[in-house]
């Protein structure tokens, strides 16, 4: 028998107005509908209705993980420092890692992901190729000290995540485990009713090679991705690669210095000279683990520090400050040029191809130089694709202009390879009787993030609108207010429950019909069944929450329809 939840006994307190600090739709509605409450910055409590939705998402994830052969475990969230030191992630995670000490001074962390601990577990449990492949997963809270928690549960410091890990003896096995997860994720997000895109991505601090993100398009999303209208190319903006066009061989004039007073920015320089910003060469200075690096890009483009950081990893990248120019005659703030930077590593975007001519800094105050040609007047140490992707940039696959969109990351899959196995010497005895280094995959789904993404994608002006698979109930029965209507509503609710239907029934006394109807729309159960003006005749009104379609049904018809 399915549960019948009476709102007269349910701890729920809806709000008429949006929270003052709410910036996104999911934040506003999940708080107003009393699904979650803020405990501290980035830390949320899940209330009865919200916990049901969260559990339903976790159930779908668990069912599909089990179906693909995953084995569920539960590892601790409080973890020792040493395994993360062994892989370098104790430092790589930086300030996002929650660190703490016990009373004896031993250092620990709250797990952001569990690659190290799962690797150690498999090292202890598996000794032969016969023990592999194996896929282990858990659904557990994760912790990251976000600098600016925002968007409600979308970017919190504690969040619920499914993380799974595959262990194989060969790269071919890893590819199969990766494909299994990819297919399972598609099934999961389809069952949840999430519109999603699969895009190429970068691995970041996780390490490894192949990596794809599952993104849910939504205006509140913090990820930007591109897709091509002409082919199937799609990628996170940090993973987009630019194919430099061929440069015609042209004999450029000699370098000529220009008097350019008070033009330390590209905007002021372009205006002063009356040239487009694209004719200028912007030279951004950064520090990579304390070493100054110059990055050259066309003046009308911006440097993507995320991309740059990926290229320079594991070095920590930060912008230079005014103090970094002190005592450096070769670096003139606002007038840096690539020529004469022998003491500085020079990285250029592929658009700064050999043979291209630029207007750029002359390394003198109030002075620029024109006809500065890459490959003739300065050398590039490394060509790296480091510009921010823009709408209309050419697709790397077919050349068509790319489209930009915002999205919420709901899943990420990685082929890690042997990074973690190398750190812990994870070997098994192979078929030939010799040690074989294990190869590994890592796969995550943001369970609580999926709730936020669904709220963003499915809500309307009235409130939440959950898909049946994860809604807190199948039907929301509303008693309009009179005793007869309440009696009918409770009777129908019990009969529906007996038929296996999950029911939320609003039997609250002293609450106006208008408030009940508003709450039903806000809470977002997919079907709303009203015991109203025709209750004496045994007739109810059924409303589809998503489409707004209404029809009148007898009690028997309603039970037959909703229990089918």
UniProtKB/Swiss-Prot annotation:
Consists of three domains: the N-terminal catalytic domain, the editing domain and the C-terminal anticodon-binding domain. It comes from the Bacteria. It is an enzyme of class 6 (ligase). Catalyzes the attachment of proline to tRNA(Pro) in a two-step reaction: proline is first activated by ATP to form Pro-AMP and then transferred to the acceptor end of tRNA(Pro). As ProRS can inadvertently accommodate and process non-cognate amino acids such as alanine and cysteine, to avoid such errors it has two additional distinct editing activities against alanine. One activity is designated as 'pretransfer' editing and involves the tRNA(Pro)-independent hydrolysis of activated Ala-AMP. It is found in: Cytoplasm. NCBIfam families: PRK09194.1 (NF006625), proS_fam_II (TIGR00409). The keyword Heme does not apply. One of its GO terms (biological process) is prolyl-tRNA aminoacylation. This is Proline--tRNA ligase 1. The gene is proS1. Keywords: Aminoacyl-tRNA synthetase, ATP-binding, Cytoplasm, Ligase, Nucleotide-binding, Protein biosynthesis. Transmembrane segments: none annotated. Its EC number is 6.1.1.15. Homodimer. Belongs to the class-II aminoacyl-tRNA synthetase family. ProS type 1 subfamily. One of its GO terms (cellular component) is cytosol. It comes from Streptomyces avermitilis (strain ATCC 31267 / DSM 46492 / JCM 5070 / NBRC 14893 / NCIMB 12804 / NRRL 8165 / MA-4680). InterPro entries: aa-tRNA-synt_IIb (IPR002314), aa-tRNA-synth_II (IPR006195), aa-tRNA-synth_II/BPL/LPL (IPR045864), Anticodon-bd (IPR004154), Anticodon-bd_dom_sf (IPR036621), Pro-tRNA-ligase_IIa (IPR002316), Pro-tRNA-synth_IIa_bac-type (IPR004500), Pro-tRNA-Synthase_IIa_type1 (IPR023717). SUPFAM superfamilies: Class II aaRS ABD-related, Class II aaRS and biotin synthetases, YbaK/ProRS associated domain. It catalyses: tRNA(Pro) + L-proline + ATP = L-prolyl-tRNA(Pro) + AMP + diphosphate. GO terms for molecular function: aminoacyl-tRNA deacylase activity; ATP binding; proline-tRNA ligase activity.
């Amino acid at each position: 028998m399915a549960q019948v939840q009476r709102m007269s006994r349910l701890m729920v307190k809806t709000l008429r107005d949006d929270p003052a600090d709410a910036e996104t739709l999911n934040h506003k509605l999940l708080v107003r509908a009393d699904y979650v409450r803020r405990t501290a910055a980035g830390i949320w409590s899940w209330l009865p209705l919200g916990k049901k939705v969260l559990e339903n998402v976790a159930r779908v994830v668990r069912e599909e993980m089990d179906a693909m052969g995953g084995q569920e475990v539960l590892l601790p969230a409080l973890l020792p420092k040493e395994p993360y030191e062994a892989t370098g992630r104790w430092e790589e995670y930086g300030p996002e890692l929650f660190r703490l000490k016990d009373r004896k001074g031993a250092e620990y962390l709250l797990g952001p992901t569990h690659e190290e601990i799962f690797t150690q577990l498999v090292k202890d449990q598996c000794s032969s190729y016969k023990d592999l492949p194996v896929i282990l997963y858990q659904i557990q809270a994760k912790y990251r000290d976000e600098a600016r928690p925002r968007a409600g549960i979308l970017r919190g410091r504690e969040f619920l995540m499914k993380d799974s890990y595959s262990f194989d003896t060969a790269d071919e096995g890893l590819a199969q485990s990766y494909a299994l997860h990819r297919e399972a994720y598609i099934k999961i997000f389809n069952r949840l009713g999430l519109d999603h895109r699969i895009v190429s991505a970068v691995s970041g601090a996780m390490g490894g090679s192949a990596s794809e993100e599952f993104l849910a398009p939504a205006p509140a999303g913090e990820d930007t991705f591109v897709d091509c209208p002409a082919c199937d190319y799609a990628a996170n903006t940090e993973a987009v690669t630019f194919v430099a066009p061929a440069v015609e061989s042209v004999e450029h004039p000699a370098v000529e210095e220009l008097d350019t007073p008070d033009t330390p920015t590209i905007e002021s320089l372009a205006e002063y000279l009356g040239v487009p910003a694209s004719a200028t060469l912007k030279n951004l200075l950064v520090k990579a683990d304390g070493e100054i690096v110059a990055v050259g890009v066309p003046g009308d483009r911006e440097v993507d520090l995320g991309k740059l950081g990926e290229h320079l990893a594991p070095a920590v990248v930060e912008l230079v400050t005014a103090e970094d120019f002190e005592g450096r005659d070769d670096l003139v703030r606002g007038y840096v040029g690539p020529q004469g930077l022998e003491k500085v590593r020079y990285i250029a975007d592929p658009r700064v191809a050999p043979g291209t001519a630029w207007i750029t800094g002359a390394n003198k105050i109030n002075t620029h130089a024109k006809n500065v040609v890459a490959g003739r007047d300065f050398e590039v140490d490394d060509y790296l694709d480091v510009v921010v992707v823009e709408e209309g940039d050419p697709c790397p696959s077919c050349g068509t202009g790319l489209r930009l969109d915002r999205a919420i990351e709901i899943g990420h899959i990685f082929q890690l390879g042997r990074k973690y196995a190398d750190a812990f010497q994870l070997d098994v005895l192979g078929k030939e009787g010799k040690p074989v280094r294990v190869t590994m995959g890592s796969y995550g789904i943001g369970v609580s993030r999926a709730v936020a993404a669904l709220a963003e994608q499915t809500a309307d002006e009235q409130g939440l609108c959950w898909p049946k698979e994860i809604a807190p109930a199948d039907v929301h029965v509303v008693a309009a207010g009179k005793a007869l209507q309440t009696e009918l509503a409770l009777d129908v609710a019990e009969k529906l429950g007996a038929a296996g239907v999950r029911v939320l029934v609003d039997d609250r006394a002293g609450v106006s019909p208008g408030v009940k109807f508003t709450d039903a729309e806000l809470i977002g159960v997919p079907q709303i069944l009203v015991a109203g003006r025709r209750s004496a005749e045994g007739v109810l009104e059924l409303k589809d929450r998503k489409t707004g379609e209404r029809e009148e049904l007898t009690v028997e018809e309603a039970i037959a329809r909703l229990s089918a």
